[in-house]
Amino acid sequence: MGAARIAPGLALLLCCPVLSSAYALVDADDVMTKEEQIFLLHRAQAQCEKRLKEVLQRPADIMESDKGWASASTSGKPKKEKPSGKLHPESEEDKEVPTGSRPRGRPCLPEWDHILCWPLGAPGEVVAMPCPDYIYDFNHKGHAYRRCDRNGSWELVPGHNRTWANYSECVKFLTNETREREVFDRLGMIYTVGYSVSLASLTVAVLILAYFRRLHCTRNYIHMHLFLSFMLRAVSIFVKDAVLYSGTALDEAERLTEEELRAIAQAPPPPAAAAGYVGCRVAVTFFLYFLATNYYWILVEGLYLHSLIFMAFFSEKKYLWGFTVFGWGLPAIFVAVWVSVRATLANTGCWDLSSGNKKWIIQVPILASIVLNFILFINIVRVLATKLRETNAGRCDTRQQYRKLLKSTLVLMPLFGVHYIVFMATPYTEVSGTLWQVQMHYEMLFNSFQGFFVAIIYCFCNGEVQAEIKKSWSRWTLALDFKRKARSGSSSYSYGPMVSHTSVTNVGPRTGLGLPLSPRLLPAATTNGHPPLPGHTKSGSPALQATPPAVAAPKEDGFLNGSCSGLDEEACAPERPPVLLQEEWETVM
């Protein structure tokens, strides 16, 4: 009863951080292409020029102050301040004249400098504006600075015919230090190696489950769909990175300067639906679809295990079709809706960045699957604890009981994606320094290697899979040994650990070529001179008595192991749920 009472409260407590910051989990792969950066700069320029016209048409407002312009600025409210002398050294004249006694002449006119929309500037003051958020790689917590001289003109750079401005706080992210570069290189290596290892191991796991017919059952079909979703997610990430990250501003961060940003802004605006966007839009769409299908197949695994535990009558074939439509079809619906809305209402850029509230078309279904799957995980762990307590009711070794529960929980965590909630309460935008590095290394490691862990637990460490591989290996080595002995003409051959010294020539009848005659080619046994009916064997006949045990064993063995193939699947379907449930317990325990 204790575990049953604690589990719902624990689920509610842990679901709160899941809902609060799962947005960062889903939206963590945004990247700005150079074309999108140009588009955003031109859009900011158009908005600035429109508001400049509105302000310049009111001369009275210009002579009063910049209050009207401050409210119309697109980049936030400007602030007039005197920064430190290192960045903005004051002239001797400014130092001698107190601020309150300075003449209030004509202010500096607002203008667009191809990076930022500057408001009216009070004469003799330093104007500070927040770094624009439409430049993706800027430090959005910093400020850019300009000085308005006492004559109502923006201060010029000495020796150059251009306006002085200080963007050093904004571009500090564009001049990466060696240590920061090493961190990103290390994260990229973890990211690439993790998804590569997952992709390779999942491919082997799918081939194993598809090759052995005795492993063809509903449980393993669901595992194969889950493995395939992890594989497609990894492939889509590699394709998206190859398409988007080539030619981004981030790749040229160390060479990017303020002048180059102005040059980008002065370039002609790209068309809204350029042909160059087709490839990256397709890559982003498939990435979002396979990301959603991966989350939904993780949910299908939880629903299947939950159904085996709590449903008395469970029709596997009927639910398999439903699970397939749910795992692959439902994500296709809301991704298609998102594509239609984005193409109609926000057909700009490469579609990789969020566009207002339209992002929730994809994020809400994914968040719902994460929350539901976590609730299923808590409920299944509760049942595990109850089962272990009932099994060890007469024993006093509670330490072993808790050890088994911990092991079972750790096995279920990679499948249900429980590791996502560790840093759920600290989104990317709220961490920095050491904590940010710890979070990024943790998420890159577990997210990329999750497919590998799932393949290890549900394929390579599965007892049924290991038994089939051992049987296949024994048959293959036996066939090679038999062929080698037959070619050498030896009088002995081995069958596993048993050695027979029977002559090879006495093994069975031979054909005219000297090869052993297959039992299928031997004449059929006759009854009163007539061959028996197909499928009929007379009771007590030598044929019935001589039937090897291995001929009848597969059906019974398959029934006990829950791995039906062919006609056997129908025969053992009514009794399979308890058997399958026992197998799932064995896998988890």
Swiss-Prot record:
Important for interaction with G proteins, short sequence motif: residues: 473-476
Signal peptide: 1-28
Source taxon at top rank: Eukaryota
Lipid metabolism keyword on record: no
Cell location: Cell membrane
Cytoplasmic side: 210-223, 316-318, 382-404, 461-589
UniProt key word Disulfide bond: yes
InterPro entries: GPCR_2, GPCR_2-like_7TM, GPCR_2_extracell_dom_sf, GPCR_2_extracellular_dom, GPCR_2_parathyroid_rcpt, GPCR_2_secretin-like, GPCR_2_secretin-like_CS
Sites where a glycan is attached: 151, 161, 166, 176
Keywords (A to Z) from UniProt: Cell membrane, Disulfide bond, G-protein coupled receptor, Glycoprotein, Membrane, Phosphoprotein, Receptor, Signal, Transducer, Transmembrane, Transmembrane helix
Transmembrane segments: 189-209, 224-244, 295-315, 319-339, 361-381, 405-425, 440-460
Lipid bilayer topology: Multi-pass membrane protein
Swiss-Prot/TrEMBL GO biological process terms: adenylate cyclase-activating G protein-coupled receptor signaling pathway; adenylate cyclase-modulating G protein-coupled receptor signaling pathway; cell surface receptor signaling pathway; intracellular calcium ion homeostasis
Family statement: Belongs to the G-protein coupled receptor 2 family.
Function: G-protein-coupled receptor for parathyroid hormone (PTH) and for parathyroid hormone-related peptide (PTHLH). Ligand binding causes a conformation change that triggers signaling via guanine nucleotide-binding proteins (G proteins) and modulates the activity of downstream effectors, such as adenylate cyclase (cAMP). PTH1R is coupled to G(s) G alpha proteins and mediates activation of adenylate cyclase activity. PTHLH dissociates from PTH1R more rapidly than PTH; as consequence, the cAMP response induced by PTHLH decays faster than the response induced by PTH.
The name this protein goes by in its record: Parathyroid hormone/parathyroid hormone-related peptide receptor
Organism encoding this protein: Bos taurus (Bovine)
